[in-house]
Amino acid sequence: MGKVTFNMTMSLDGFVAGPNDNPDNGLGDGGQGLFNWYFNGDTEVFISEGTPPLKVSKQSAELMKESFSTLGAGIWGRKTFDIAHAWGGHPPGSPAFIVTHNIPQEWVKEGSPFTFVTDGVESAIHQAKKVAGDKDVVICTPSILQQAIKAGLVDEIYVDLAPILIGGGVSMFDHLGIGPVELECIQVTQTPDVIHLAYRVIKK
């Protein structure tokens, strides 16, 4: 059975986007610098069909390729789905499960890469794990992560720590609503533009 993981880029002060993030301002005010590491390297990595490759460091490329090789399904929230404009129908993790209260009917069709889940995060994780089989399910939205941690369903957390202070916006770990969650550091990879951190969630 694969693992349930979380992976996002975060600023040094804990934000994954600046204030006022929306479909016309995807990373929010001041958030663009989070992803400089996507373009400052010399190794190409393709993350989804129909999009140009990223150019990252060799170390980052190796980690990303390893991550994609074990990816069985992805989970996002509806806000992320809308901000990304549905990734043009090519999400960077397919099949893609979208947790939402309102299903966008234009994407309910044969061949759609999206499964819309209206009965909560735990249901989305259960469905994604069933599809992923022996591969991993990756969560890519902070609010989904927070709910999944509360439910004790997250096995590992991967943070790409960007060298920037945003000062406000979308916090990765807001609203946990529980006591301390102990983590075990399992990997640290330092590059000139980003530090990749990996933690195992210690479950009690």
Where are these regions (language model features)?
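Enzymes that bind and transform nitrogen-containing heteroaromatic metabolites
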Residues: 1-204
